[in-house]
A protein has these predicted regions:
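Histidine-centered beta-alpha loop that forms part of the nucleotide-sugar donor binding/catalytic region
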Residues: 27, 72, 118
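Glycine- (often His-adjacent) and acidic-residue-rich active-site loop
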Residues: 7, 48, 63-105, 121, ...
Length: 203
């Protein structure tokens, strides 16, 4: 039976089963829980394994510290060694597989999924939150698509996820401007289900 702490293979990702809820915590607070080459594969595996675990009834994803997830670790990408040479088709195929096994897997999980945002969610981090069934955020949280600020197009299904929730016109606005959207506005746009005061968010 899956109870207590679950070994994720890295201290960058924590997982604990509490009363049949798998609480998965992105644990890189020093980088606002940005996704990188260690945490991301571990997150994929936890989503898959806990999604298939008969002793788990729901998944909750949250972030350590004051952020949910800042998206991809852009600084880490810049400091990485030489990339493996790939054709454009190979790069597209790799990205599709990464998306399918992360946000795609979240959408497909046949159990309730909840994103609990203690603070900002941006880029791929926002996509992870949007892929969950329910989003609960602290009052100081905000979201941003972020991609336009670093000259990238949206990935991890964020275009589809946003369009499904807010419609084509608003989704395009959020993607093109990469504006910060505060928690109250997110609730008004139905991007989140509930806003919780900061002081009681972790209760």
């Amino acid at each position: 039976m899956a109870t207590g702490s679950i070994d994720t293979g890295t201290d960058q990702l924590l997982c604990e089963v509490r009363e049949r809820v798998a609480v998965i915590t992105l644990n890189r607070p020093e980088s606002r829980n940005a996704l990188g080459d260690i945490i991301t594969p571990a997150l994929r595996r936890m989503i898959r394994e806990r999604g298939e675990d008969p002793d788990v009834g729901a998944l909750l994803i949250t972030g350590a510290g004051t952020a949910f997830c800042a998206g991809g670790d852009v600084k880490g990408m810049a400091n990485a060694g030489p990339a493996v040479e790939m054709t454009p088709d190979q790069k597209v195929a790799r990205l599709k597989e990464r998306q399918r096994t992360l946000t795609g897997a979240l959408v497909a999980v046949r159990k309730p999924t909840v994103a609990a945002l203690p603070g900002p969610a941006a880029g791929a981090g926002l996509a992870i939150a949007l892929a969950c069934d329910i989003r609960i955020v602290s009052s100081s949280a905000f979201i941003s698509t972020g991609y336009a600020r670093v000259g990238l197009s949206g990935d991890y299904g964020i275009v589809w996820l946003l369009t499904r929730l807010v419609g084509t016109a608003k989704a395009r606005e959020l993607l093109f401007t990469a504006d910060r959207v505060d928690s109250a506005t997110c609730e008004r746009l139905d991007l989140v289900n509930r806003v919780v005061p900061n002081k009681t968010f972790r209760d």
